[in-house]
């Protein structure tokens, strides 16, 4: 996949740069986390933004897709193109291929539904909030990749294909009674979400992803995703 991003994707989209960086790390750990914006993408289990708990020890390749796309800054291809954070796949047995987008909200899962405004115009861009934005990011990422014939062929060989929205709920840092109450409120909503999703995330309907042969799942941090299903 790394070579495909270095060679086939640029060729397909008519991109010309002598050096193309593809941020990548791998692990054979059964349990690990991914974190966006850290020095490393793969971090200790429970310490990142999404947790993986695997049933089979194989080499897992993680690609920082957002970082890769940012490397094309200044091109018409990159400008305005939605993207997810990570590509995660079983590099040995082709067991799974995952597109992961990470997000967060303060206090309550309800805040994930708040409309998102366009920073330039102030108009509502995503009426459905982060739920809608993440879905759009995953759909556009999938379409961008599958438009490249060799990448589509590479993706099709995997047994399980998943688009995964992962999120973390945070509390405000003020150490007062109001903040403590908000943190209690956050814990309660995590418990509600746990009942909704279980340990493998909620299975959602998304025609734009399902039509491409991908499951669409949503999971809260604190609960683990099993890539093998």
Model-derived features: positions:
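Sequence/structural signature of beta-propeller domains
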Residues: 72, 108-120
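Short acidic, S/G/P-rich loop/turn micro-motifs used as interaction or catalytic elements
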Residues: 75-78, 94, 105-109, 173-178
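Catalytic centers of nucleases
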Residues: 80-89, 134
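Conserved catalytic cores of phosphodiester-cleaving nucleases, focusing on short active-site segments
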Residues: 86-88, 96-107, 119
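Short, solvent-exposed secondary-structure capping/transition elements
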Residues: 95-99, 108-112, 147-155
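Catalytic cores of nucleic-acid endonucleases
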Residues: 118-170
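Short, low-complexity, polybasic intrinsically disordered segments
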Residues: 166-229
């Amino acid at each position: 996949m790394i070579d495909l991003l270095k060679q086939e994707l640029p060729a397909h989209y008519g991109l010309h740069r002598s050096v193309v960086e593809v941020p990548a790390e791998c692990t054979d750990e059964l349990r690990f986390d991914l974190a966006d914006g850290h020095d490393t993408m793969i971090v200790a289990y429970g310490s990142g933004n999404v947790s993986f708990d695997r049933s089979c020890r194989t080499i897992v390749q993680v690609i920082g897709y957002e970082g890769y796309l940012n490397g094309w800054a200044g091109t018409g291809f990159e400008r305005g193109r939605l993207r997810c954070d990570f590509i995660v796949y079983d590099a040995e047995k082709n067991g799974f291929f995952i597109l992961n987008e990470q997000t967060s909200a303060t206090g309550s899962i309800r805040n994930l539904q708040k409309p998102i405004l366009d920073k330039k115009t102030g108009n509502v861009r995503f009426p459905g909030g982060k739920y809608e934005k993440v879905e759009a990011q995953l759909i556009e990422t999938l379409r961008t990749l599958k438009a490249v014939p060799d990448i589509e062929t590479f993706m099709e060989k995997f047994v399980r294909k998943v688009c995964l929205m992962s999120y973390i709920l945070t509390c405000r840092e003020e150490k007062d009674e109001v903040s403590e109450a908000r943190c209690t409120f956050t814990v309660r909503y995590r418990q509600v979400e746990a009942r909704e999703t279980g340990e493998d995330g909620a299975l959602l309907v998304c025609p734009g992803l399902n039509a491409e042969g991908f499951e669409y799942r949503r999971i809260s941090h604190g609960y683990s995703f099993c890539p093998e299903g």
